[in-house]
Regions:
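Flanking helices and flexible, charged tails adjoining ferredoxin-like Fe-S electron-transfer domains
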Residues: 317-392
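Short amphipathic alpha-helical interaction segments
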Residues: 61-77
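Short, amphipathic alpha-helical interaction segments positioned at domain boundaries
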Residues: 90-137
Length: 392
């Protein structure tokens, strides 16, 4: 098969709002070859972000509709193809009718990269690392809105904060479902392949996506109590919720639908933004940590728990420690007390629930800084494309 076939698919994926950088070395082509067959690459290369039925695709590319349908369906669980559903139509198109299947090209991240656990080996891990360094990380992580959003851990926000942003209500998610998919972390596995070891935190940590109630329990399918307890343990250990937007799971309104649970030592987003030199990876939450100096004992727990090194001792003045409008906030760091670099803080709340003296709280950002969560795939894509256009 011609190299043009792989080039076409790479260009098509890069044309998506998520991005898939074209590098000088062509490492992205090697990632595609590692993950998919030639026939799969050819058909996927004919797709775009516009939703089409299998019959429409087959007619356009001149192939048998049964053959096209079979290939498309096989690529859905591997995330190279997205199955459209109500509320997820591309701009200018009507939402998919109930019972009608429409297909569109899926992104690399979040997408077929995370679905690559079945084929993940040292070669794939090295290719991904090279891709991130050569421009892939910046292309994916730098544009806004981010491909994932930070959701503060349970117990770090006031009830009124959660009421204002229902997509932060993790407990409501557990009440909506009885079964949950929890899978191994592809990032942690990649670190093990690259370095021969990883951190001691759990491998099974990601997903927590709701499943039909009749789904059989198993190694990766947990009931409500098991899933909630596991997520609670991960929160106490300092994992950060980098959550999926509701529309990625066909939710009709912004709501919590699942999350990666990330540690700074393994996470592809945290690691990738550092390798790429990107200031911000996941979309920050609308809250920032504030430390009250009076109950703070300078124990250092928050410094150790912060995944982005946004907290330090007050004597080591941070560049973003400036007079703050938040009630009770520190306006100047006190020697020996912990202080938050507001510009670096991502609003994850990990420091809040780990403070033994309850000296840390989360405060909302100003209305000018407030990030309004996209309510549909079309909304997210259009906002990201507008951002990209403005950068040119």
């Amino acid at each position: 098969m011609s190299e043009d076939t792989y080039e076409r698919l790479a260009n098509a994926i890069d044309a998506l709002p998520h991005g898939f950088a074209r590098t000088a070395s062509g490492v992205e082509i090697e990632l595609i070859k590692k993950a998919f067959t030639e026939d799969e690459v050819w058909l996927a290369g004919q797709l775009t972000r516009t939703s089409e039925t299998a019959a429409e695709i087959a007619q356009r590319v001149g192939r048998d509709v049964g053959e096209v349908t079979a290939t498309l369906e096989s690529l859905i669980p591997r995330r190279l193809v997205r199955l459209d559903s109500p509320g997820m139509a591309a701009p200018g198109l009507a939402p998919t009718a109930v019972g009608e299947k429409k297909y569109r090209l899926g992104p690399f991240l979040v997408g077929w990269y995370e679905a690559s656990m079945r084929l993940l080996d040292k070669e794939f891990a090295e290719l991904f690392e090279k891709f991130v360094v050569e421009g892939g990380g910046e292309r994916i992580f730098a544009p806004r809105p981010g491909v994932l959003g930070v959701v503060p851990v349970r117990g770090s926000l006031k009830p009124e904060h959660v009421e204002r942003e229902p997509h932060l209500d993790i407990d409501a998610h557990f009440q909506r479902h009885e079964r949950f998919l929890v899978i191994p972390c592809v990032c942690k596995r990649e670190i093990e392949l690259l370095h021969g070891k990883s951190c001691k935190k759990p491998m099974k940590r990601c997903g927590f996506v709701g499943l039909p109630p009749q789904t059989p329990l198993g190694e990766t399918v947990l009931d409500r109590e098991e899933a909630s307890k596991l997520l609670g343990r991960l929160e106490k250990m300092g994992h950060v919720h980098l959550a999926f937007y509701g529309f990625t799971m066909s939710a009709e309104s912004p709501q919590f639908v699942g999350t990666w649970n990330c540690c700074s030592c393994c996470c592809g987003v945290f690691h990738g933004q550092k390798l790429a030199g990107v200031a911000e990876g996941a979309q920050k939450s609308n809250y920032r940590a504030v430390i009250d100096p009076d109950p703070c004992t300078a124990c250092g727990a928050c410094i150790l728990r912060c995944p982005v090194d946004a907290i330090a001792e007050g004597a080591k003045r941070l560049p973003s420690v400036i007079p703050c409008v938040c009630a009770g906030a520190m306006t100047e760091p006190e020697p020996g007390k912990s202080v938050v670099d507001r510009d670096k803080c991502i609003g994850c709340g990990v420091c809040v629930i780990g403070c033994p003296t309850e000296a840390i709280r989360m405060e909302p950002v100003s209305e000018e800084e407030w990030f309004h969560v996209p309510n549909s795939m079309a909304d997210w894509e259009e906002r990201r494309l507008e951002y990209l256009a403005a950068q040119k």
